[in-house]
Amino acid sequence: MKYLFLLFLLICSCASKQHATVIDSTQVNASPCPEDGDCTFEVLSNQSFSIEKDGIGALYPKVVDGNTIILKFEYKRNDIPNTVDGQYRELVYLELNRDHLEIDLKEDELNNVKALFARLCFCRGQTGYYIINQGQLSIKKLSESQYHLKMRFKIDEVPQVISEIDEVISFK
């Protein structure tokens, strides 16, 4: 019984991280992440995505096996206590050609990497996926396998929390 109580205390004492976590690569620099949530950064190798439309014309990404690299940044706000449907997430997807990782793009050139933003919440009329065509994206080579990604962007269609991504990543 004493061990169950200690286990309960251990589980209850866990706290959320306040910085970005990089999955499938090495984290060196964390993007600014709001204190009220967690941020993750994923490198999806040998994957590709297309931007599809559903039956009502809303956009969504369709991820399939491919020969490109998908970068996925996610901000997930901590759930608000005592609320139903209080979840809130923002995602940014980028697709990179593995043979041409160094890039410097702005505005409509962001279409070259299929820059896609998602706001997922119970926010009537203000949720969904949106093409990013305002901003700048720079990926510079630091070493043989390490790159610095810096992105600033703006979405006019919906409010956004995340407007900047700054990561140093290693491709395996």
PLM features per residue range, with description:
Residues 1-7:
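Sec-dependent signal peptide recognition
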Residues 5, 62, 85, 128-130, ...:
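Sterically constrained small-residue positions within well-ordered secondary structures
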Residues 11-13:
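C-terminal motif of bacterial Sec signal peptides marking the signal peptidase cleavage site
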Residues 17-125:
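An ectodomain-focused feature that recognizes extracytoplasmic/extracellular
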Residues 44, 72-76, 95-97, 106, ...:
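A structural detector for beta-sheet-dominated domains
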Residues 78-80, 99-101, 144-146, 156-158, ...:
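Generic "edge-of-domain/loop-turn" microfeature
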Residues 90-101, 159-172:
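A short, surface-exposed beta-strand/turn
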Residues 108-166:
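Acidic, glycine-rich flexible loop segments
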